């Protein structure tokens, strides 16, 4: 397992890149989560051992929304649209494992 950021880990299991998000209590889309997702998608694109990507969240919530604790500090790159564009442009099928 490789930590992409404090909140996102990268592993490959049975040929699938697994991006595991862990940002308690609700896996909000903080700067660290957005950055980790972007790094994870980029890493999976380059990883010949991965043929697909799964995004999974620890805990009981799958990405509850923006991290309101960051509102006062202003926008930080990467913005959500950059992360979504990387997911959209990925040549590998991507699945969100929502539980």
Where are these regions (language model features)?
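Conserved CoA-thioester-binding segment of acyl-CoA-metabolizing enzymes
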Residues: 1-58
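Hydrophobic alpha-helix-in-membranes signature
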Residues: 24, 90-92
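Glycine- (often His-adjacent) and acidic-residue-rich active-site loop
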Residues: 42, 49, 56-89
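A short, small-residue-rich loop immediately preceding and capping a beta-strand
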Residues: 92-99
């Amino acid at each position: 397992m490789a930590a992409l950021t404090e909140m996102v880990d990268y592993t490959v299991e049975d040929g699938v890149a697994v991006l595991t998000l862990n940002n308690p209590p609700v896996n909000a889309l903080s700067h660290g989560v957005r950055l980790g997702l972007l790094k994870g998608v980029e890493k999976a694109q380059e990883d010949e051992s991965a043929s697909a990507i799964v995004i999974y969240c620890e805990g009981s919530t799958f990405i509850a929304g923006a991290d309101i604790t960051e509102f006062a500090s202003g926008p930080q790159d990467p913005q959500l649209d950059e992360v979504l564009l990387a997911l959209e442009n990925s040549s590998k099928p991507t699945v969100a494992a929502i539980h």
